[in-house]
A protein has these predicted regions:
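Long, low-complexity intrinsically disordered regions enriched in Ser/Thr/Pro/Gly
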Residues: 44-45, 77-80, 131-135, 139-148, ...
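Multi-bladed beta-propeller domains
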Residues: 16-30, 62-78, 111-124
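Beta-strand-rich domains and repeat architectures in extracellular enzymes and scaffolds
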Residues: 1-13, 22-37
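Structural motif
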Residues: 9-13, 51-57, 99-106, 145-161
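Blade-terminus and WD-like Trp-Asp/Gly-His loop motifs, strongest in beta-propeller folds
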Residues: 33-41, 81-89, 129-136
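Beta-strand C-termini and the immediately following turn/loop, strongest in propeller blades
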Residues: 2-9, 43-50, 91-99, 138-146
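Surface-exposed acidic loop/strand-edge motifs in secreted or periplasmic proteins
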Residues: 45-55, 70-81
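Conserved binding-pocket/active-site segment within a compact domain
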Residues: 90-95, 100-142
Length: 166
């Protein structure tokens, strides 16, 4: 079984093999990996650097496979955040470009790679943080008051994801 250790000092992920060997998982600054509810897989975003095209990866702690799940979408949208719903579904924030903090909420089905859009807001309204609890997705975000995107208000919204999953 492989292990992932997040190095907060340089925002890198260290891979510890089943033999205790340590090496960097990749060459980029990454988000802290999140382990699946079953403890067999992990997700992380990389590179997590300003003005970089961020991608979502799935790491299999059993066999060491590291798979890119989502890169840029239509050349303009990319993952900004991801959390586990269960061993089959992820909740994602996918936003516009490299400059936005958040975006719309999606579900990703790991069994068939289906991406399901849950919210459909323009760039002025963005979810920036997701939390999951007992079938409900708690979204925290910002809504800009004008197209200039200088002033904003914070909002919270709760989504019943059972409406979108089996």
């Amino acid at each position: 079984m492989y292990q992932l250790k997040y190095r907060r000092s340089d925002n890198r992920i260290e891979l510890i093999t089943e033999y205790g060997e340590k090496k960097l998982l990749n060459d980029s600054i990454s988000s802290k990996p999140t382990i699946s509810p079953g403890g067999l897989k992990a997700i992380y975003l990389s590179p997590c650097e300003w003005e970089s095209i961020t991608k979502l990866y799935l790491f299999d702690l059993g066999n060491g496979d590291n798979i890119q799940l989502i890169g840029d979408i239509d050349g303009a949208y990319m993952p900004k955040g991801a959390i586990w719903i269960d061993n089959s579904y992820l909740a994602l924030i996918i936003g516009f470009g490299t400059f936005s903090d958040g975006g719309n909420v999606y579900l990703y089905n790991l069994m068939d790679s289906q991406l399901i859009k849950i919210t459909d807001w323009d760039q002025r309204k963005q979810v920036v943080k997701l939390e999951y609890n007992s079938g409900f997705l708690k979204c925290k975000g910002i809504e800009y008051l004008s197209d200039m995107m200088e002033e904003y208000i914070e909002f919270k919204e709760i989504l019943d994801i059972k409406l979108y999953t089996l």
